[in-house]
Amino acid sequence: MRYCIQHATSADVAFMALAMDPDSGEWGSNETEHADRLLMTCASSTQVWAARDNAGTPCALWGVAPKSDDEEIGCVWLLACEQFEQEPADFRNLSGMVFAEMLGEYVQLENFVDVRKERAVELLRSIGFTVDPAATHSASGTLCHRVWLEAGNTRSLSLAERSAVLN
């Protein structure tokens, strides 16, 4: 599959909001809450990137917002459609390019990932993120891994140095 990475548009975000699993509970309890929460997350982000397939359909979003207590650290988030279940290497490569670009703005990217999301943790580890041992996240009370990536620790090239199209 061929993908193109560009800054996300409102149409990309709207499409992904509609494509979200209404039973996931991650972004709210119903489709309206999912869309509202995704829109708020995008609005607070300094960068939001979209991957589109060769038909121009959005299939992934990545974003980063400054951490509230340290604006040099970016709180990274991502959302991907099911097609990447069969194409994990493509998603890993796309993610690496986007995260490298984000590290041009932030000295570190981090977030907390629920321990039950083993595939997400392994994806982030494979890109170069450090995965800390599981601990209870104080804000949510959920057992999470802190995942983080420092600017000097990326194996990927920036979007400016690589083609934004992945074959």
Model-derived features: positions:
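A short beta-loop-alpha structural element at the N-terminal edge
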Residues: M1-L18
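Active-site rim helix/loop that mediates acceptor-substrate recognition in acyltransferases
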Residues: G28-Q47
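Charged interaction scaffolds used for protein-protein
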Residues: S45, R52-D53, N153-S156, V165-N167
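Conserved beta-hairpin
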Residues: S45-V64
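Conserved acetyl-CoA binding element of GNAT-fold acetyltransferases
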Residues: E71-E85
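Conserved acetyl-CoA-binding loop-helix of GNAT-fold acetyltransferases
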Residues: E87-E101, E122, S126
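Conserved beta-strand-loop-alpha-helix junction that forms the acyl-donor binding cleft
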Residues: L109-R125, H137-A139
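Conserved catalytic-core motifs of GNAT/GCN5-like acyltransferases
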Residues: F112, T130-H145
